[in-house]
Amino acid sequence: MKVTRRGFLGWTGALAAAGVAGGDRVRTLADVGAATYQAEVPPQGVEAWLPSVCAQCPGGCGILVRTVTSVEDGVKRAVKIEGNPYHPISRGTVCPKGVAGLQALYDPDRIKGPLKRSGPRGSGQWASIGWDEALAMATERLRDLRARGEAHTLVAVAGQVRGLMPVLLARFLEAYGSPNYVTTAEGCEISRQVMHLTQGIAEPMAYDLERSAYVLTFGAGLLEAGWSPVRQGRAFAYLRQGTPGRRARIVHVDPRLSVSAAKADEWVPIRPGTDGALALGLAHVIVSEGLYDKAFVAERTFGFDDWGDAGGPPRLGFKSLVLEEYRPEAVSAITGVPIATITRVAREFAGARPALALGGGGASLHTNGLYTRLAIQALNALVGSVEAPGGTTAQRRPPLTVLPPVRRDAAAQRGLAMPRLDGAGTGRGALVTSAFHALPGGLRAGKPYAPGALLLYYANPAYSSPEFARAPELFEKVPFIVSFSPFMDETTRYADLVLPDHTFLERWQDDPVEAVWGPPVLGLRQPVVEPRHQTRHTGDAIIQLAQALGGAVAEAFPWKDFQGLLRAAFQGVAEARRGLIMAAPFEEARQRRQAEAGFWIPTYKTFDEFWNQMAERGGWWDPAGPPRDPAQAFQTKSGRYEFVSLGLGPLGTRPPTAGPRPNQPAAAPEAPSVPARGDRAFLPHYEPARVAGDAKEFPLQLVTYKPMALMGSRTANQPWLAEIPAGGPSRAWEAWVEVNPETAHRLGIHDRDEVWVESPAGKVRLRARLYPGLHPDVLAIPYGAGHAAGGRYAEAWGANPNRVVGGEADRLAGIPALQGTRVRLVRA
């Protein structure tokens, strides 16, 4: 039977109108039919493929966008997205989120120009205004705030924190005089903290997956979430068949049988929040049986053995700790992992060199997250997989030009001397530079002062933050709110002024890769089409706002626009005399051999040629990366990898020391942030995760996970992605709660029953799906649905699990405890 476009749409429309046996499936077909044709279908024209960088997730994948310039009206339209074969992260591949990027560009509910609130906050009443009026309004409010000596009360919250845009925002706050630059990417910062505490390098941790022989993952969904599903998927394929005659073994630790767990060689179910105990139990077996890399431990680490000065008491070392406290029997009782499994996995891990252990959000987002990740990294140190092939390394950065320092005038100096609203850098947050999870408490209490204004850059705390999601009235405590979102999300509804950004297919931006690989990779995002609406690059808006404020604030922004800042920063890369413009693998191999022989042969003579080649190929990278000798690899006080984290000294009454002699004693900390005292507080150790609620009243624990097709607020308005089931018992256009069949039978709940998931913090209504791939004491809810705003495709389906997540946090790492909340399940 021949199906025409008109017939297909008529058929799906009839099904939707009938509303019969198909139920919510009927809605799916109708919505997908409409969404497929929502974008403009271009007439005949001139085709071109333009490189850019995807922004649908943090992966930083290079893409090629097919455009068609109409011969009728001369308008260029983007019609398809594929992977860029030159980009080392994607190599011609792209995930479903990347393909759906067109739907961000063509979203019918995009904000089409500046808006001024004309009714009560949250009422949805807006007046369209021009850009001159909008910027004048923002300038007047900020100038008045500064004139009153309240510059420090300005708060900026950023959700996308790579590249020069967060640098620009932080620079604006510094010049203006506010210490309150806050990021919502707290969970992504924990690997940077682990690198800082163990190696003294404040960069994200990267992983040499392809060269590993054994990969042990703790709560890391490499194939569906994580840092870059495309890059990780390519690495996974290489582990399976990249080297003839060699197949790496992959073991996945998680309470839920995820896509990554199903594709691994072995899934190890575990109780939520106990990953650190398991890692230390594995370490016990490796150490007790002498399976560790004795040369690396002796020559490159500090704190493995007990240590201390001749005149002082002995200090506890990692070896004594794990041998005394983490026997497999004790660890099995904590984690639920059988003793035999603990012993076998430890022996496999130590025997298959190189081996790699890595942790993800499932292991990190608990109140014990930092110590858990330190314990996981200790496994890599035991087998010599730190700064080694097949192991971990610090992410290298591209050699961008360093921006000139900001001249702080008197108003800026006074403002920057004030404490932060989120408490970062002091007390319990002494080790972190941003603590977004603590911001609601500061707003609620008005301490240490009340906020005066709030800038929101790709941040949607009314959805992503448990505290804000339950209490959006907190925004009423802020007199003036500006959102730069291109979409009317949950938080933008409470703004006073909306200055909508371009979508990622309409703007210039740098995208340096982080926490994926290791070599420095700098992607260039460029506009592939003209802006469809009266939107403006947020970087341009910030520069114009700064220049309108005048004085020292304007001096800090000498660039005409954000593209001018990009070009100035990229000068450093062009002049570094290393690396290469992205190219085909065989070209890169030739240039790499030249570099190894001591030659660097550029493909450009001027900066303009360099810039044009970047735009033509998609970016720059350095396959070799800068050389890293031991002095560069370990920049700690001891000059070694530190099992005993001397960088935790700020938590104690006095910091521990390690100079030329790495056996100097440390002070026993009296830390309000951690239950442990004495030497244990400086070592990887297991602390039971703090969870709200009585175990008898709330006997289950909730874990949330990110399916491949959902990225919170970034992709909520893209129906192609909502149509993709997430694996397991999922269906499209639906959110659910997964229940182990044994647990469901005990509670009298059947598959597809309507149920309430309740916690001490709140409750959400969902459909129960029975799923045997789940620990019996655990419920699982996908994260990314349940939006109350964001447009017709984002709203009115699913539920936001953050409404039941408690308000606990890992105060040491400054991250919210989004996993392991105590809950109960009752029939609706």
Predicted segments with their positions:
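Extended redox/cofactor-interaction regions of prokaryotic respiratory oxidoreductases
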Residues: 167-253, 276-280, 333, 377-494, ...
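Acidic/polar loop patches that form or flank catalytic/metal-binding clefts of enzymes
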Residues: 79, 292-295, 342, 356-357, ...
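Short beta-alpha connecting loops at secondary-structure transitions
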Residues: 262-268, 502-509, 520-531
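N-terminal export/assembly segments and adjacent metallocofactor-ligating motifs
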Residues: 1-292, 313, 329, 338, ...
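Conserved short loop/turn motifs at secondary-structure junctions
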Residues: 153-162, 334-337, 360-367, 398-400, ...
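Long, contiguous, secondary-structure-rich segments that constitute the structural scaffold
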Residues: 527-531, 538-597, 601-604, 657, ...
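C-terminal, active-site-flanking charged/polar segments
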Residues: 477-480, 484-509, 513-521, 546, ...
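N-terminal leader/propeptide and maturation segments of large enzyme subunits in energy/redox metabolism
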Residues: 117-133, 291-338, 528-642, 753
